[in-house]
Amino acid sequence: MSWGTELWDQFDNLEKHTQWGIDFLDKYAKFVKERLEIEQNYAKQLRNLVKKFCPKRSAKDEEPRFTSCLSFYNILNELNDYAGQREVVAEEIGHRVYAEIMRYSNDIKGERKSHLHEGRKAQQYLDMCLKQMDNSKRKFERECREAEKAQQSYERLDNDTNATKSDVEKAKQQLHLRTHMADESKNEYAAQLQNYNAEQHKHFYIVIPQVYKHLQEMDERRTIKLSECYKGFADAERKVIPIISKCLEGMVQAAKSVDERRDSQIVVDCFKSGFEPPGDFPFEDYSQHIYRTVSDGTISTPKQESLKPDPRMTVGKAKGKLWLFGKKPKGPALEDFSHLPPEQRRKRLQQRIDELSRELQKEMDQKDALNKMKDVYEKNPQMGDPGSLHPKIAETTSNIERLRMEIHKNEGWLSEVEGKVSQRSERRHSAEANHLVAQGRESPEGSYTEDANQEGRVQPQHHAHPEFDDEFDDDEPLPAIGHCKSLYPFDGNNEGTLAMKEGEVLYIIEEDKGDGWTRARKQNGEEGYVPTSYIEITLEKKQ
């Protein structure tokens, strides 16, 4: 199938078809450009959306690290990566499809113009040959008519008896001249005819088929280029599918990481005050005086009245605690956090101690480095003056002493808080025990007996030195609340941390309080803190 043989007489239609092909190419290029702009705008809008909803937190922000919030932030990160992949798609389409198709469109326009010009030039040359042949044909026809007239004139004069010999001779010469001119025009016409036939054969069997062949090849290349662009368009999407799939998988994993129990525990850690709920108001039996008067005719004052709690004191204490369920009174922030509830105060003090400990470790490391540098300078004076390090060493020493004093002061406050919490718990258990004993000794009349010795046995005995209790408590290890598997190795160089290897299984004895550290225990009983992000935790289900 060839345009040169099948469409030898369809030059105008082929010209229109090739122009339509170029117009369609430009139309597809416009489509790709608009598709490219859509991808760019989509990626830009996604990035703006992520930027809008990403947390803008300062270094001092103490936003609770809820798993639902962390999951959402991870989803935003994955969405940001997804937007980056849309930008990659736009870039691929721009370079591999749009730029290529625009370059090819310009090339094919020039090539088409050249082929059509060659076809028109061949047609013009054939038309010129036809015109020359037609002119020679008319001349030959005219000369033949003139020769025929000359022959008729000669024959008429030759048969005329009245004609002179000179007239006959003159007519004869004219006949020979016209006959000669007719022969020459005949030869010229024959030559022009032969030439035109040859050029026409060459035109329709060689020149035009060659031109049409080039046009056909050009149009087929245009079709192939469109096919390649279609495929490149799809390949640009296909290349990013694996990464987009990872982004979507990351979103799914972020959704699975939401732990409602952990979020509930974070709420407890953030807002737990450490206070005990208000106690019950005691029943004050004013009728017992009436019953005693009716039964024995006397009015007596109960001996256990001194054991009754003062209603005014009870109400006062209750009112002092009821702010937990209402609006918390605001007060100035104190250095020892005494304006905070006990549990929050303990947490803030522990955080400050941890921060001061890290600063202390940095200062000690800096002091060690300065001392080593000083030793090097003393051994090699050409490297530096040891005396130049004395101010810096003195400053570091002063900072170390200051930090140690701060840590000691905060540890004292922390011990005070923990002691108060422990005493409050003991008083609660003591009150419960007294309440049970008092119920056992209550008389049917609503009065109390005077068994003071029994009350003495029920009262719990408090240690004079509560710090001894802490020492005994440390001997008994904390119970494990779950286990974990280390995902990465951790050297545990800092004080209080626990070194672990990758894949090592540990017991969890204390959950992350929101500072990024989890307390764990090894199989050999060694305890310490490990980074929460380095382990995979499995907590025991609470019965």
Curated annotation (Swiss-Prot):
Organism expressing this protein natively: Xenopus laevis
Keyword entries, A-Z: Autophagy, Cell membrane, Coiled coil, Cytoplasm, Cytoplasmic vesicle, Cytoskeleton, Endocytosis, Lipid-binding, Membrane, SH3 domain
Membrane topology category: Peripheral membrane protein
Segments forming domain REM-1: 339-416
Gene Ontology cellular component list: cell cortex; cytoplasmic vesicle; cytoskeleton; plasma membrane
Record function comment: Required to coordinate membrane tubulation with reorganization of the actin cytoskeleton during endocytosis. Essential for autophagy of intracellular bacterial pathogens. Promotes cdc42-induced actin polymerization by activating the wasl-waspip complex, the predominant form of wasl/n-wasp in cells.
Protein name: Formin-binding protein 1-like
Pfam annotation, one family: FCH
Stretches assigned to coiled coil: 66-258, 334-426
Record-annotated SH3 domain positions: 479-540
InterPro entries the UniProt entry points to: AH/BAR_dom_sf, F_BAR, FCH_dom, FNBP1L_F-BAR, FNBP1L_SH3, HR1_rho-bd, SH3-like_dom_sf, SH3_domain
CDD domains tied to this protein: F-BAR_FNBP1L, HR1_CIP4_FNBP1L, SH3_FNBP1L
Residue ranges constituting the F-BAR domain according to the UniProt record: 1-263
Residue ranges of the region described as Disordered: 424-467
Residues flagged as site, Mediates end-to-end attachment of dimers: 165
Lineage: Eukaryota, Metazoa, Chordata, Craniata, Vertebrata
Domain notes: The F-BAR domain binds the phospholipid membrane with its concave surface. The end-to-end polymerization of dimers of these domains provides a curved surface that fits best membranes with around 600 A diameter, and may drive tubulation.
Similarity annotation: Belongs to the FNBP1 family.
PROSITE patterns named in the record: F_BAR (PS51741), REM_1 (PS51860), SH3 (PS50002)
Top-level taxon of origin: Eukaryota
Quaternary structure (record): Homodimerizes, the dimers can polymerize end-to-end to form filamentous structures. Interacts with GTP-bound cdc42 and wasl/n-wasp.
Any single GO BP term: autophagy
Subcellular location: Cytoplasm; Cytoplasm, Cytoskeleton; Cytoplasm, Cell cortex; Cytoplasmic vesicle
